[in-house]
């Protein structure tokens, strides 16, 4: 940018169409967050009515993560082929329909299936909305675009908590899910009133349709084998999370089978750049493992361990959700200032100072607990607002929606595992200790993976001929693309 351009406030670099695109996608994220967290708010009520164990109840949260990998792949491919806008609308319709079905669910299995539908819609919303906004904004503002957008999910969670305190005590838990159908009205408006993403239009204007991940996996020479593997992965995940398997060895074998299938899909769809894709899945997996025990089971902890009433639970969750929303926006500014990876690492390190006090303080002082949660979530959860930008930078425009959607949502299986891990550990420790210890230990893994830029580093080790040296979104160099001690100026010469 020129000096004159740099002196202009960042928000003046955006025109009305770009702000409208952002506003529409942000509202979609808000509604997504609202629908998704409803189950966490009423988990104890559902558990009591259906007579579920704590692990079974936690699996209802996990269900939405089980289907996300497939939703991310299919709806992401739709976004790559037909445009980001259509994928956004389809995603909203899916998660709204699944939420309504939860309200009518007569038992555990029906609700589990409805949560699978929600997961598919949520995955599509994540991949399509993130790529839509990132590709609509100027390159130098795309950390902000990512962070500001993801804040909508946390705001939706805050709104859901407030609605919970007003609706459930009077009309019961099912009424909360009936409200979740409202986003379909928004989807109809969205279809008519927002423009297509600029990057996508430039790439596809007047050209033949791209070959998407769906084309590669399900219309190529290995389509029969891939369909069989897809069914095998879905069946294995079902038995792992809904089949009530007691044998840990069988669960481990099924988990390894799923991992092998997902790696196979990544190798087929990304070719020589598969090490980058696999490592991105690992990054996201651990990002969910550190964050989602708290996200999923915090309402249960507040209601059971601290014995808070619904109104107090809503107040505490307001601090938590609002902190995450603020953190997403702060993360956008940090990403522009420090760079995406450095901002991520610094924010997570700061959050580690607060995670133990959050669960050590107890419930005597609600306001102190709320403030601790606000800052911990701002630093620990909010920084994930720039994760779409971080992941998207490893993919070209042609495969960005599907690549981001599939990679992120396979890794998001950590979110399926996280609440169950928390519930299992809570059988031996109290729930607060379980949540705090999981989050504290696994955050360090994410710090190392992102701080060392392991996707680029492993790519350089295994398939250096396909190494991407610069971020595909903002053009900045990847630190892991060069060995330690090499001149970073070399990256400028090898920019791809």
Curated annotation (Swiss-Prot):
**Entries under Gene3D superfamilies matching the protein:** MFS general substrate transporter like domains
Q: Which UniProt keywords apply?
A: Cell inner membrane, Cell membrane, Membrane, Sugar transport, Transmembrane, Transmembrane helix, Transport
Q: Which InterPro entries match?
A: MFS (IPR011701), MFS_dom (IPR020846), MFS_trans_sf (IPR036259), SA_transporter (IPR004742)
Question: Do you know which PROSITE patterns this protein is assigned to?
Answer: MFS (PS50850)
Where does the sequence pass through the membrane?
A: 22-42, 58-78, 92-112, 116-136, 148-168, 170-190, 224-244, 247-267, 278-298, 313-333, 353-375, 406-426, 431-451
Question: Any idea what job this protein has?
Answer: Catalyzes the proton-dependent transport of sialic acid.
In which compartments does the protein localize? Cell inner membrane
Q: Pfam families this protein is in? A: MFS_1
Q: Which family does it belong to?
A: Belongs to the major facilitator superfamily. Sialate:H(+) symporter (SHS) (TC 2.A.1.12) family.
Tell me what reaction this enzyme catalyses. N-acetylneuraminate(in) + H(+)(in) = N-acetylneuraminate(out) + H(+)(out)
Membrane topology term reads: Multi-pass membrane protein
GO terms for CC? plasma membrane
This protein is called Sialic acid transporter NanT 1
What GO molecular functions are on record for this protein?
A: carboxylic acid transmembrane transporter activity; sialic acid:proton symporter activity
């Amino acid at each position: 940018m020129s000096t004159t351009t740099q002196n202009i406030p960042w928000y003046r670099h955006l025109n009305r169409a770009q702000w409208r695109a952002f506003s529409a996608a942000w509202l979609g994220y808000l509604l997504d967050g609202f629908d998704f967290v409803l189950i966490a708010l009423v988990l104890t009520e559902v558990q009591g009515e259906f007579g579920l164990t704590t692990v079974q109840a936690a699996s209802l949260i996990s269900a939405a993560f089980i289907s996300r990998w497939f939703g991310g792949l299919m709806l992401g491919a739709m976004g790559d082929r037909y445009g980001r806008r259509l994928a956004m609308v389809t995603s909203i319709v899916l998660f709204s329909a699944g939420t309504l079905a939860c309200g009518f669910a007569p038992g555990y299995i029906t609700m589990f299936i409805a949560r699978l539908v929600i997961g598919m819609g949520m995955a599509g919303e994540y991949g399509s909305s993130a790529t839509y906004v990132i590709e609509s904004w100027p390159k130098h503002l795309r950390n902000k675009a990512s962070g500001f957008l993801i804040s909508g999910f946390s705001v939706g969670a805050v709104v859901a908590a407030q609605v919970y305190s007003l609706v459930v005590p009077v009309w019961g838990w099912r009424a909360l899910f009936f409200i979740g159908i409202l986003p379909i009205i928004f989807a109809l408006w969205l279809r008519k009133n927002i423009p297509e993403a600029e990057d996508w239009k430039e790439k596809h204007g007047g050209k033949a349709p791209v070959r998407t991940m769906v084309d590669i996996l399900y219309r190529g020479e290995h389509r029969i084998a891939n369909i069989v593997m897809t069914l095998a992965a879905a069946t294995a995940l079902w038995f792992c999370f809904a089949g009530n398997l007691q044998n840990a060895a069988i669960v481990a074998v099924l988990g390894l089978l799923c991992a092998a299938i997902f790696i196979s899909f990544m190798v087929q769809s990304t070719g020589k750049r598969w090490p980058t894709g696999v490592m991105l899945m690992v990054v996201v997996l651990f990002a969910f493992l550190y964050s989602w025990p708290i996200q999923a089971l915090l309402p249960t902890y507040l209601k059971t361990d601290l014995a808070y009433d619904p109104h107090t639970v809503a107040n505490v969750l307001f601090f938590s959700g609002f902190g995450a929303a603020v953190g997403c926006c702060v993360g956008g500014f940090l990403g522009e200032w420090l760079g995406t990876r450095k901002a991520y690492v610094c924010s997570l390190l700061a959050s580690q100072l607060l995670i133990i006090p959050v669960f050590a303080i107890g419930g005597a002082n609600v306001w102190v607990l709320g403030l601790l949660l606000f800052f911990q979530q701002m630093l620990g959860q909010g920084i994930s607002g720039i994760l779409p930008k971080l992941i998207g930078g490893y993919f070209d425009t042609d495969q960005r929606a599907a690549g981001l959607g599939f990679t992120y949502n396979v890794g998001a299986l950590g979110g399926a595992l996280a609440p169950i891990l928390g519930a299992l550990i809570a059988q031996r420790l109290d729930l607060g200790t379980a949540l705090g210890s999981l989050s504290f230990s696994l955050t360090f893994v994410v710090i190392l993976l992102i701080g060392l830029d392991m996707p680029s580093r492993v790519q350089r080790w295994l398939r250096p001929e396909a190494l991407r040296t610069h971020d595909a979104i903002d053009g900045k160099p990847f630190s892991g693309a060069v060995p330690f001690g090499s001149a970073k100026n070399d990256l400028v010469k090898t920019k791809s």
